[in-house]
Amino acid sequence: MDKKATRLRRARRARAKIAELKVHRLSVHRTPRHMYAQIIAPDGGRTLVAASTVEKDLRSRAEGTGNCSAAAEVGRLIAERAKAAGVERVAFDRSGFKYHGRVKTLADAAREAGLQF
């Protein structure tokens, strides 16, 4: 198995466990250049809020888009948007990525901004 296939296998297992909880899911995706985060409804059918480093206002604020400071901005932004949408408690879906570096920074920033997981 290659690296992507093993990551996707880990993600599938985690998502199955999160689906049993019936809570909103904070899904994170990272590429070498960007970070993406979205909050998905418990039924898995729709995205309630999203934030990423692709957004114009976030690109202008951060020094680059593929680093920890940009990931922290995405974490703060997704938490603010989630609270505005009435979501305070989520399950963290790291999409099979290691809980380290940018993924951990995004999660910590979202927690500091008031999201509970």
Curated annotation (Swiss-Prot):
Any one GO BP annotation for this protein: translation
Function field: This is one of the proteins that bind and probably mediate the attachment of the 5S RNA into the large ribosomal subunit, where it forms part of the central protuberance.
PANTHER family: 39S RIBOSOMAL PROTEIN L18, MITOCHONDRIAL (PTHR12899), LARGE RIBOSOMAL SUBUNIT PROTEIN UL18M (PTHR12899:SF3)
InterPro entries attached to this UniProt entry: Ribosomal_uL18_bac-type, Ribosomal_uL18_bac/euk
CDD domains: Ribosomal_L18_L5e (cd00432)
Gene3D superfamilies for the chain: 3.30.420.100
Record NCBIfam families: L18_bact
GO CC terms: cytosolic large ribosomal subunit
Domain of life: Bacteria
Subunit architecture: Part of the 50S ribosomal subunit; part of the 5S rRNA/L5/L18/L25 subcomplex. Contacts the 5S and 23S rRNAs.
Entry's family note: Belongs to the universal ribosomal protein uL18 family.
Protein name: Large ribosomal subunit protein uL18
GO MF, one example: structural constituent of ribosome
Keywords: Ribonucleoprotein, Ribosomal protein, RNA-binding, rRNA-binding
